C-alpha cells in the first residue's frame, strides 16, 4: 500500500529543511499568504536535493491573517490570482531545472473551494490552463476534487492528520472546538483509520467514509517533526510506503 505524505513549506517555519527529509510532497507558499521569491527558491532547491515532489500553494491575498480570512471574490479574479501564483513558482522551478507536480490551495481558499463549486471551477480552470498535467490536490470528496475531474485533471484526495472532521467529511472550522488535534496518539490513530480503513470519526462521534490519497501534516505545529517521524515509523511497521 502506498500513501503520499505532504507538508506546507515556505511559510516562515525554521523546520522546513528537516521536514523536507520526512515527507514525499511539499506545497510551497507563493507569496499571497506567506513567503516570497527567496523562500520559493530556497524551498525548490531543498525539495530537489531531497527528491521531494513539490507544487504551488496559492492563497487568497491575505498576508495579514495567513490566508485564513474568508473572502468573496469574483471567480475571474480567483482564476487570475491562482494563475499568477502558479506562474511565479513555475518560473523559479524552470530556472532550477525542476518539474512542478501539483497545486494545492491554501487556508480559506482551500476551505471555501471545498464547498463552493464556482470557486472550485475557477481554481481547476487555472490549473488546467497553466499545465493540464499538474495534479490538483483538494479535500477528499470536495467540490474542488469534482471540479478537477470535470477538467480532466489528475486529482489527489487529501486528509489531515491533525484536524478535526465534521460528519459531512468537511474540516471543523479553526475557530470552533475540536478543530485542531493536539494529542499525538489521537492524530496517529485518526491517520491510520483514514489510510487503512477509509473512514474518519467526526467530532460528533459519527463515522464517515473518506478517500485518503495524501496525508497533510502541518509543519508549523510544535511537535511537527517528532510526529512526522512517528507517522513514518507507523507506516513502515504496517508496510505502507510513503511515496509521491
Curated annotation (Swiss-Prot):
GO terms for molecular function: 5-oxoprolinase (ATP-hydrolyzing) activity; ATP binding. InterPro entries: Glyco_hydro/deAcase_b/a-brl, LamB/YcsF/PxpA-like. It catalyses: 5-oxo-L-proline + ATP + 2 H2O = L-glutamate + ADP + phosphate + H(+). GO terms for biological process: carbohydrate metabolic process. Pfam families: LamB_YcsF. The keyword Nucleotide-binding applies. Keywords: ATP-binding, Hydrolase, Nucleotide-binding. Its EC number is 3.5.2.9. It is an enzyme of class 3 (hydrolase). Forms a complex composed of PxpA, PxpB and PxpC. Catalyzes the cleavage of 5-oxoproline to form L-glutamate coupled to the hydrolysis of ATP to ADP and inorganic phosphate. HAMAP family: PxpA (MF_00691). This is 5-oxoprolinase subunit A. It comes from Salmonella paratyphi C (strain RKS4594).
Amino acid at each position: 500500500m502506498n500513501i503520499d505524505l505532504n507538508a506546507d513549506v515556505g511559510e516562515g517555519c525554521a523546520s522546513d529543511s528537516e521536514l523536507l527529509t520526512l515527507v514525499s510532497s511539499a506545497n510551497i507558499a507563493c507569496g499571497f499568504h506567506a513567503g516570497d521569491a527567496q523562500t520559493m527558491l530556497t524551498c525548490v532547491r531543498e525539495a530537489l536535493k531531497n527528491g521531494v515532489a513539490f507544487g504551488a500553494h496559492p492563497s487568497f491575498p491575505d498576508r495579514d491573517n495567513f490566508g485564513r480570512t474568508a473572502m468573496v471574490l469574483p471567480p475571474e479574479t480567483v482564476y487570475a490570482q491562482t494563475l499568477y501564483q502558479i506562474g511565479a513558482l513555475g518560473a523559479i522551478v524552470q530556472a532550477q531545472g525542476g518539474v512542478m507536480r501539483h497545486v494545492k490551495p491554501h487556508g480559506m481558499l482551500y476551505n471555501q473551494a471545498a464547498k463552493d463549486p464556482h470557486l472550485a471551477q475557477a481554481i481547476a480552470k487555472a490549473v488546467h490552463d497553466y499545465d493540464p498535467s499538474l495534479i490538483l490536490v483538494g479535500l477528499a470528496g470536495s467540490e474542488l476534487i469534482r471540479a478537477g475531474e470535470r477538467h480532466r485533471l489528475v486529482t489527489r484526495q487529501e486528509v489531515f492528520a491533525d484536524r478535526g472532521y465534521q460528519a459531512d467529511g468537511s474540516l471543523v472550522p479553526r475557530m470552533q472546538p475540536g478543530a485542531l488535534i493536539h494529542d499525538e496518539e489521537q492524530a496517529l490513530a485518526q491517520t491510520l483509520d483514514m489510510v487503512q480503513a477509509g473512514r474518519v470519526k467526526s467530532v460528533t462521534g459519527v463515522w464517515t467514509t473518506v478517500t485518503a490519497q495524501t496525508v497533510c501534516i502541518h509543519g508549523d505545529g510544535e511537535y511537527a517533526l517528532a510526529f512526522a517521524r512517528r507517522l513514518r515509523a507507523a507506516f513502515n511497521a504496517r508496510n505502507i510506503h510513503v511515496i509521491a
